[in-house]
Amino acid sequence: MTQTLTLLGLESSCDDTAAAVVRQTTGAKAEILSSIVFGQTELHSAYGGVVPEIAARAHAEKLDSCVRDALAEAGLTLGDLDAIAVTAGPGLIGGVMSGVMCAKGISAATGLPLIGVNHLAGHALTPRLTDDITYPYLMLLVSGGHCQYLIARGPETFSRLGGTIDDAPGEAFDKTARLLGLPQPGGPSVQAEAEHGDPERFRFPRPLLDRPDCNLSFSGLKTALMRMRDQIIAEKGGLTRQDRADLCAGFQAAIVDTLVEKTRRALRLYLEDKPQHPTLAVAGGVAANTEIRNGLMALCFELETDFLAPPLALCTDNAAMIAYAGLERYKTGARDGMSLSARPRWPLDKTSPALIGSGKKGAKA
């Protein structure tokens, strides 16, 4: 029996307010009818990081207009929807609550079913939205607030192989940019500087490569960079443009080498299951880094595994991924209703021990 489902998704777990409409017909690839994102970079730039209270107020102010714009772009009304999906965690609790309250209001007014979505599941299921790949696949979520290796086995079934025990790589990129006086967000700024630098001039540590597991650590890289910067300033009285470029190149090379080696270990564990179509998918803002993508692509070629990276707009936080993850849950019969609550922490793999630490852009899960 052919069925067409249309869902509205809401996302407000950090510093992006987003709404989107996704539609899927049985047997066909899902289609993004609209995707609206309001960023908050300017609101937080003076503070060196996301301020939860400011973020929550901005979400509350923008969610209604986000929903209106998403419906208008899709050419639909609330009456054309089958359900509403909303990020219910993990994330900054004030922002998550704003989204959940907005979704509950729409559900109460329209009678639409309400479906809570794990923000990380939204990222993890994005490859199925963009490329309709089959389970199981290996997911590397690498962003400002998270870094995890997950085997996606179903819309709500994930096995975590490892993750960061302290800071996320995106947080390390942002801190590096601040230490070197580069613009935020740090990822693009550091990458741009690194293109003109020598990655061999400054040798950064490759954290935890002496361990056989898939866990990562990035806090030590920030400390190493700060010490190198301070030493240069003490010796020369300041940093030249070339000093900055070389520091960025060395730092980025350490991130790439660490991720490639840890991903090699995660892929070997994943491939033990002998998946029919072996695939490594990456998502999160840091996945936009060209050197990281190139390193992972070369690794996948070596291990005869497909490599998939969604478009940048779907790597960073967005509501299309939430709508699609909600659509997958909807098809399993999941409904949450008014009992849905916001959750600051929400691990995808409940059987794995908790990861240590909390990133600048939200709690680790």
Curated annotation (Swiss-Prot):
Where, by residue number, does substrate bind? 141-145, 174, 187, 289
Where the protein is mainly located, per its record?
cytoplasm
The entry's keywords: Acyltransferase, Cytoplasm, Iron, Metal-binding, Transferase, tRNA processing
The listed locations are: Cytoplasm
Annotated EC: 2.3.1.234
A GO MF label? iron ion binding
Recorded GO CC terms? cytoplasm
Cofactor(s) this protein requires = Fe(2+)
- Where is the stretch described as Disordered? 341-365
Reaction(s) catalysed by this chain, per the record, are:
L-threonylcarbamoyladenylate + adenosine(37) in tRNA = N(6)-L-threonylcarbamoyladenosine(37) in tRNA + AMP + H(+)
**Cofactor comment in the record?**
Binds 1 Fe(2+) ion per subunit.
Does the record's keyword annotation contain Metal-binding?
yes
Into which EC class is this enzyme placed? transferase
**Annotated residues for binding of Fe cation:** 119, 123, 317
One Pfam family named in its UniProt record: TsaD
Give the record's family classification. Answer: Belongs to the KAE1 / TsaD family.
Q: Which PANTHER family match?
A: TRNA N6-ADENOSINE THREONYLCARBAMOYLTRANSFERASE, TRNA N6-ADENOSINE THREONYLCARBAMOYLTRANSFERASE, MITOCHONDRIAL
* Role: Required for the formation of a threonylcarbamoyl group on adenosine at position 37 (t(6)A37) in tRNAs that read codons beginning with adenine. Is involved in the transfer of the threonylcarbamoyl moiety of threonylcarbamoyl-AMP (TC-AMP) to the N6 group of A37, together with TsaE and TsaB. TsaD likely plays a direct catalytic role in this reaction.
Name the chain's protein: tRNA N6-adenosine threonylcarbamoyltransferase
Taxonomic placement:
Bacteria, Pseudomonadati, Pseudomonadota, Alphaproteobacteria, Rhodobacterales
